[in-house]
Amino acid sequence: MRESMRIELELQTDNFTVIPYNHQYYLASAIYNKIHSANPAYAKRLHNYQKFKFFTFSLLQIRKRVIRKEGIETIDGKAYLYISSPNNEFIENFVAGLLEDGKLRVGNVEFFVRKAKILPIPKKFNILKTISPIYLKTMIETEDGLKTYDLLPNNSKFYENLKNNLKKKYEAFYNEKCDMNFEFEVLKFRPKRMRIKNDIYCRCSEMVFKVWGDYDLIKFGYECGFGEKNSMGFGMVVNVEDKNQKNKKLKTKI
């Protein structure tokens, strides 16, 4: 299996452009469009694989911003996007599509790609922080039958599902049984209600959490995302090097 890769894109649009809060669907569409432009056969294969896609991406990270009712206003028009996958074929095709015109359209907003940078994979993990929220669900029995219930860290099922989900993705990607394990402790979390597309909403969690256990399994979560719906922009994390980060207020970019 090929080496993993994570990239940072520095994007530029007009000053004072307003970005919608729920822009994950637009980003997912933009990513697929770029891949399809570069390699239609790979894009079709990726789209048709129903179980796991093995990539994730962040929400747009807008550092100079004003929060408006209709969305986030970019003061200087600059935003950052992070994309990660355990398979370079995905990243290579996305970058190839991006190089065709150097643009990325997010809904009605057109960004120009100013810079693209490959980021190194950390040698160790301790504290992780989400840059797109983690989504998990379970099924519960009701009088009307089985219903989908979105999980947050205040439910013990959240912890079980997060670990099991990561191991299942690892087994599917490497086509081998995963005997590795990891544990985690949630240091801070903030519940979010996000619109996936149209009128479909979900409850998810922005988190800072401590991890320990088998490095390769944690690294795989870092590469392809923790939790479900990674390919829709959920579950991307960054490694927090500052050991005092857990005592700081959790700042949300979106």
Swiss-Prot record:
Gene3D superfamilies tied to this protein: 3.30.70.1890, 3.30.70.1900
Sites marked Transition state stabilizer: 53
The keyword Plastid is assigned to this record: no
Active site: 32 (proton acceptor), 47 (proton donor)
Catalytic activity, EC: 3.1.-.-
Sample GO molecular function, one term: endonuclease activity
Alphabetically ordered keywords of this record: Antiviral defense, Endonuclease, Hydrolase, Nuclease, RNA-binding
Lineage: superkingdom: Archaea
GO BP annotations listed: defense response to virus
Role of this protein: CRISPR (clustered regularly interspaced short palindromic repeat) is an adaptive immune system that provides protection against mobile genetic elements (viruses, transposable elements and conjugative plasmids). CRISPR clusters contain sequences complementary to antecedent mobile elements and target invading nucleic acids. CRISPR clusters are transcribed and processed into CRISPR RNA (crRNA). This protein processes pre-crRNA into individual crRNA units.
Entry's family note: Belongs to the CRISPR-associated protein Cas6/Cse3/CasE family.
Protein name as catalogued: CRISPR-associated endoribonuclease Cas6 1
Organism: Methanocaldococcus jannaschii (strain ATCC 43067 / DSM 2661 / JAL-1 / JCM 10045 / NBRC 100440)
Underlying gene: cas6a
